């Protein structure tokens, strides 16, 4: 059952936070959405973390005639995995993004102009540090669960290691303890696409550098898919409107990348894309610790990992490295390798593959 129309909420923290870089980012505005009702002691809250270009609009619609629900609508609502008759679900837009939370596209109150490249470099840990302010504001002492895929999974790991006393359980899907050189190199090429768009102007543009950003997004889309899913979706079909020997004729897969790339330009800011890509590349769960073992020794909550067989952006072996480390520490950990043709995006597209296991975990830890 759908949860209907949901309205985003906004809170500003004037004091801000000290970032990993040592700089102070203040004030900080966070946009968030809530689904369901908190119980008396706020012990039924599940925090869902979004991925790279996601937002706080996890589920429901923004208005009655909204043609598209939130990005993980299928798992949120009465009777669904995150049952809003039982749980209160929270999703917050990360700092560095362009969907209402403070980021490069925000106005710097000291100058009255957009931050652009004067915005400080942020990390995934900084994102979570800002979210802690939100939990304090809402009166949430401890999350029943923190859950996310991809960059959302990184945030879940940060909650587990940095604030173990505030997390009762963790679900991390299609994520990594640190991006590989291959993942970093793909982001590098995406960055070059934006840097080399003459309309980018070193971040001081008036209008989004559409060609560079569309190309960058196209590169990203390739990493979200898999060889098998591309065969299933496109085969080697040629676009019907193009002649076979038209020099600019396109295969269906080319048309798909072009369409999604340029659609993305209308909804995401190029500088925010670059800053979040940097945060992804910098991510290392062992940052500030002697080792992953040292970092994971802090975890007290049961943790579930899900990897997807055709995910070549964050392949299963990267999840398995974390599982092995946690098992060696005697931590309560589950690992599920899901056979899927959908690549990295499988966690968004095949929720039924992990629903039973996550539901079981929530039943165990629920008050």
UniProtKB/Swiss-Prot annotation:
Annotated source species: Trichlorobacter lovleyi (strain ATCC BAA-1151 / DSM 17278 / SZ) (Geobacter lovleyi)
Recorded family membership: Belongs to the AB hydrolase superfamily. MetX family.
EC number assigned by the record: 2.3.1.31
Residues at the catalytic site: 150, 311, 344
Compartments where located: Cytoplasm
Pathway recorded for this protein: Amino-acid biosynthesis; L-methionine biosynthesis via de novo pathway; O-acetyl-L-homoserine from L-homoserine: step 1/1
Quaternary state and interactors: Homodimer.
GO terms under cellular component: cytoplasm
Residues annotated as binding substrate: 217, 345
Domain of life assignment: Bacteria
GO MF term set: homoserine O-acetyltransferase activity
Main subcellular localisation: cytoplasm
Keywords, alphabetical: Acyltransferase, Amino-acid biosynthesis, Cytoplasm, Methionine biosynthesis, Transferase
Role: Transfers an acetyl group from acetyl-CoA to L-homoserine, forming acetyl-L-homoserine. In vitro, can also use propionyl-CoA or butiryl-CoA as acyl donor.
Catalysed reactions, semicolon-separated: L-homoserine + acetyl-CoA = O-acetyl-L-homoserine + CoA
Protein name: Homoserine O-acetyltransferase
Biological processes annotated in GO: homoserine metabolic process; methionine biosynthetic process
Pfam families (alphabetical): Abhydrolase_1
Domain AB hydrolase-1: 44-350
